[in-house]
Amino acid sequence: MRSDIPETLQNFVSTKTVHQTWAKTFFCKPQAIFQPRTVDEIRELVDQARINGKTIMTVGSGHSPSDMTMTKEWLCNLDRFNQVLKKEEFSGPTRNGEGEEVKFVDLTVQAGCRIYELNRYLKENELAIQNLGSISDQSMAGVISTGTHGSTQYHGLVSQQVVSIEIMNSAGKLITCSSMENTQLFKAAMLSLGKIGIITHVTLRTIPKYTIKSKQEIIKFDTLLKNWDTVWLDSEFIRVWWFPYSGNCVCWRASKSSEPLSKPRDSWYGTWFGRKFYESLLWISVHICPHLTPLIEKFVFKNQYGDVETLGHGDVAVQNSVEGLNMDCLFSQFVNEWSTPLSSGQDVLIKLNDVIQTAREQNRFYVHAPIEVRCSNLTYSEKPFVDENDEPSLYPNKKWLAKRDRLSPGPIPGNNLRPYLDNSSNLRYDGDGANVTNDQLTLFINATMYRPFHTNVNSQEWYQLFEDIMTNASGRPHWAKNFIGVNGAHRTDQDLRKQLEFGGKTSYSMKGFNPILKKWFGENLVEYNKVRESMDPDNVFLSGKDWAVRNGILIDV
């Protein structure tokens, strides 16, 4: 029995005393870590926090490598609140008009359910998530709270699959929101940054299971630039890994399939030896001989992928949907990902390449590979579906569903609304997505710097130049990553000290985007803060306030 914890919370206080990021870049020792198992326990935690003047930080897997989840007060982890509660099937006419088939299945899950746990349930029930990011470790609440996305010309953020959300405010009241109900709250909750309330339940739109048939080609960097106008529109899913010192890229393109699984692709660093050897080489390049970095990249690329361009005849594999859409993130890392209109992509990559090669020639700094290049369709109609009577609905009508079969590209969305804090460039919506153009697509560029054996690498100069180029291309940072930010009055010694208190280092400290965030988000930031204040007048969920202030999230409304 802990004397510093209210009696009503004793049954679900954890024995854990430390919270740290997955990459071990930051850690904190909260006053207490709670793992509620029921809605009543979550409500009691919120009530006691309000009564005792505490703040609550809600965390899942800790994959955000910045200090955004660090706190000295109360921390809530929902890993024990992780059940699938409801399964609702929806059928529609087959494409040939001869009968009906299951088109989608809406699942209501407790928000602590990890994506890998949900994937197990889906596999058992012959279902699948429509679009995934690079990993499946996040919680259901976490995957939608920071703007997780995949890489596809048709799909948007993972939150596009969300039909409705239940969220608890600082008074302990559960509120349901969707594209039909409490829409302002819904647009805030779909990318909440944990500052709106505690998400308790999510209804997610899933579809019948599918496999992923992919073609993986080795292409030159110049080939990517030459084929820029067509490469992104060739398949439903696409991602590119760029290895700047070798001048190579891996172009992975894939579509839904019903074909049986094939033998997995060979992976040199997928073996125990290859993985440890690669990480050891990185350690040497980071701490002893930085100038070896280009040679190490070329060595690893040749062993993993070969050294022959295979455009038009790459190797083909069929995987289950999770293995196809997820990827091996390898080692502890800093990640700095930004979005920009895809139409700016060629110019951006050329400028980044110039910076990388110049820095190598001058022995100033070296970058790690791959640099991940992805795209998403973040255009939204901002309207609910309509039913057969042209009335607003949470569900697409049967006429729309009749155009699709199980392998049709693109989503059956859970909603068509843009979250207030969506960090894309707000490109123009142009129809129902049947004929996508590059002008509708947002490019994501992710600059990874590995931390071999959890040791630090100095990424500051590279990341600052990277951010300058992205900013000049109308870019914006991914909320959950290691961005640096801009100089300004918000940058104080006190804020830096707080980052260092949580285990951070000056070499990867964050300045934040306080001076320019309101310009970026305009009225959407105002609306987000209106929702935040209405949901949390007691500031129970204003944990991690330093990160929020540093980045200009909080404004007076």
Curated annotation (Swiss-Prot):
InterPro entries: ALO_C, FAD-bd_PCMH, FAD-bd_PCMH-like_sf, FAD-bd_PCMH_sub1, FAD-bd_PCMH_sub2, FAD_lactone_oxidase-like, Oxid_FAD_bind_N, Oxy_OxRdtase_FAD_BS. Its main location: mitochondrion. GO terms for cellular component: mitochondrial membrane. It comes from the Eukaryota. It holds the Pfam family ALO. The modification Pros-8alpha-FAD histidine is found at residue 63. Its EC number is 1.1.3.37. Its cofactor is FAD. Residues 26-209 form the FAD-binding PCMH-type domain. One of its GO terms (molecular function) is FAD binding. NCBIfam families: FAD_lactone_ox. PANTHER family: D-ARABINONO-1,4-LACTONE OXIDASE, L-GULONOLACTONE OXIDASE. Belongs to the oxygen-dependent FAD-linked oxidoreductase family. This is D-arabinono-1,4-lactone oxidase. It comes from Debaryomyces hansenii (strain ATCC 36239 / CBS 767 / BCRC 21394 / JCM 1990 / NBRC 0083 / IGC 2968). The lineage of its organism: Eukaryota, Fungi, Dikarya, Ascomycota, Saccharomycotina. The gene is ALO1.
